[in-house]
Amino acid sequence: MRRLTLALDAMGGDFGPAVTVPAALQALVSYPQLELLLVGNPAAIHSLLVKTDSVLLERLTVIPAESVITSDAKPSQAIRASRGTSMRVALELIRDGRAQACVSAGNTGALMGLAKLVLKPLDGIERPALMVVLPHKKQGKTVVLDLGANVACDGAMLAQFAVMGSVMAEHIVGVTNPRVALLNIGEEETKGLDPIQHAAVLLRDVQSINYIGYLEANELLTGKTDVLVCDGFVGNVTLKTMEGVIRVFLSLLKSSGESGRQGWLMQWVKRWMKRRLMRQFGQLNPDQYNGACLIGLRGTVIKSHGAANQRAFTAAIEQAMQAVERQIPERIAARLDAVLPKSD
């Protein structure tokens, strides 16, 4: 069994080691091939490992880091003062060959900038993108990018995202010849901002991309496309809106009461419908697909939600493992070399 070594930014996110350390231990229990490097304040980390089985501790190493980048820090300032922070040290472990991937729930802008600085983008990629795999109503999955790494994108960047998304759909989701669409305000060719229309022109000329045109946001979970491409501003707003609606819906299902004045048959029908709806919509629970992959780099970086709980952060660790096992950076590099001109 091939060993996998991941670096975890143990101090990042809203809850820091209180979430990342238990999630790390949960992952070690589930995956015997996994080794973890926990980066952060040794005292804070070790205090949560006191009762840990010594067998698990053999696959866990604490890497000291002097400080942490806070969630409210401006990315430019955070990057300038990043030496010795848990986020930067975790990324440097990939660069130095000690880890195969990094998982962080820290400041998104800082992670984006530091990852680009430390790991460097692949040839042919201007800027990496945040990507997530979302379930849809046809029991399949859709790759969506960018989700906030790049607020503004030109047409060439969107085309690069499409190529990377296609690779993810093939090797993570398992789709042959994945359909690619651009998120837009309408399906007509005349609709949309100039960068979207420019990207459409570029994608029509890439024979290895199965470009199907524009898709509106209300089709996000319908399964009409395997890859959905947009700029980071639109993608982030779309994802956060969807997550908020789903969380409210699930909470309403959980809290729906049953009137004692109803007959037993009606109560049974309501309970049956509630369980069925929970099963169907439970797969859309954001905790189950937590972890956006920052793709387009010479290494694997997973961005977890800052507010992730233990279950959600464990899901992000599993995403990192999958990306390493499927050799995603190498496959993206090979595809880019074949279909896109290299940037100057």
Curated annotation (Swiss-Prot):
Q: What is the lineage of its organism?
A: Bacteria, Pseudomonadati, Pseudomonadota, Gammaproteobacteria, Enterobacterales
Primary role: Catalyzes the reversible formation of acyl-phosphate (acyl-PO(4)) from acyl-[acyl-carrier-protein] (acyl-ACP). This enzyme utilizes acyl-ACP as fatty acyl donor, but not acyl-CoA.
SUPFAM superfamilies reported in the protein's UniProt record: Isocitrate/Isopropylmalate dehydrogenase-like
A single GO molecular-function term is: phosphate:acyl-[acyl carrier protein] acyltransferase activity
The EC category is transferase
Its principal location?
A: cytoplasm
Subunit arrangement?
Homodimer. Probably interacts with PlsY.
Keywords carried by this UniProt record? Cytoplasm, Lipid biosynthesis, Lipid metabolism, Phospholipid biosynthesis, Phospholipid metabolism, Transferase
Q: Where in the cell is it found?
A: Cytoplasm
Q: What is this protein called?
A: Phosphate acyltransferase
The organism's superkingdom is given as: Bacteria
Give the EC number.
Answer: 2.3.1.274
**What biological-process terms (Gene Ontology) are attached?**
fatty acid biosynthetic process; phospholipid biosynthetic process
Q: Where is the signal peptide?
A: none
Q: Which organism is it from?
A: Sodalis glossinidius (strain morsitans)
Family designation? Belongs to the PlsX family.
Gene Ontology CC terms: cytoplasm
Q: Which reactions fall under this protein's catalytic activity?
A: a fatty acyl-[ACP] + phosphate = an acyl phosphate + holo-[ACP]
Q: In which pathway does it act?
A: Lipid metabolism; phospholipid metabolism
InterPro entries xrefs = FA_synthesis (IPR003664), Phospholipid_synth_PlsX-like (IPR012281)
